[in-house]
Amino acid sequence: NSNYYTCTLVPDIAFFKEFTTNFDDKMIYAFENVKTRQNLGNDLGKKIIAKLKSKGMKEPWIYYIHLMDIHTPFSVPSEFDKQENGETKYDRLVSLVDVWLGRFLNEINMENTIIVVSADHGEYIPATGESISEIPNIQRLLTKGQTSISFIEKMRMKTLLNLRFAAQTYRKEKLKRTLSPYEMRSFNTRSALDLYDELVRVPLIFTGCNVVESKVIPDLVRSVDIFPTIIDMIGLCNSIKSDGRSLLPLINNKKLDELPAYMEVGINLAQLVNSKTPKVLAKIIGVRTSEYKYLRARDNLEKNVRLFDLKNDPLEEKNIVDEKPKIVKKMEGILSQFTKDSKGGEGTLTDEDIKKAKETLLRLGYI
């Protein structure tokens, strides 16, 4: 409605396809598996540069790019798989993305373009450099395509998941002898029952026009604030409905009252195959301020309850829920307001729904 030419580059996953439906120009890239997926090094980087150079980029434009290069399982191109690019595979993939970001910026007029860099979630980086979840033979069987989710197929997946869990448990017990509890949690998955800052504290960079100086803003902000900030920076109507707010005052050295951030864990394959009534809502929900993080089970106020003092315990190693009942009550009030305001729900999942969800979870590593 604002006469912007909208284009995007996203992976071939249903979620991304659906929310980019109304873009003027959409490029979908392959994300089938590690061996066949497209990434910056083998194709996508050149395509992005070609798009930025093309005459089809009618001003004003917005180009949304969702890259999966820094995503488990980590696959590092040979030219970046070197010590000089970082200690771990994750570090080396960050180096790869950094190089390509520089190439993209060389094709952009920074005087009339706003660039926003962020991530939809963080990642656990194994302390040993290798994930204990990767058990090749079981992984291949789990990712084997199926035409339906039959009773036999569900039992097969349950068996494989149980085998993998047993292997993971054995590996963890061995590692506990030499690693600290903090190091041990680096082997967790995003679909576990926790939301440490490793997963939810992500980078957020605004640069280009209307950003007059370089600085680091320490204030707590949220992903839902990104879109309202862009709208404000380019001067569009600020009446567009959104769950967030503009961060432009912070960018312009003004103060904003802190707003708490809502969070929830992802779901995993076990939730779909180990239950007679599969659910797609996250098991754990929570809320974070600059001082505290509060988590609990979605459907039980007294289950999996945790409270962390982020000022005095930034690594979130001590649960103080029994020591701070007043803070727990306050944080629960904030969280309850979030859940009250949300209008989402979940219906019954068909076998076809489970099949599609399983395929997506396998692709994204939520297993």
What residue spans do the PLM features occupy?
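Catalytic domains that recognize anionic headgroups
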Residues: 1-367
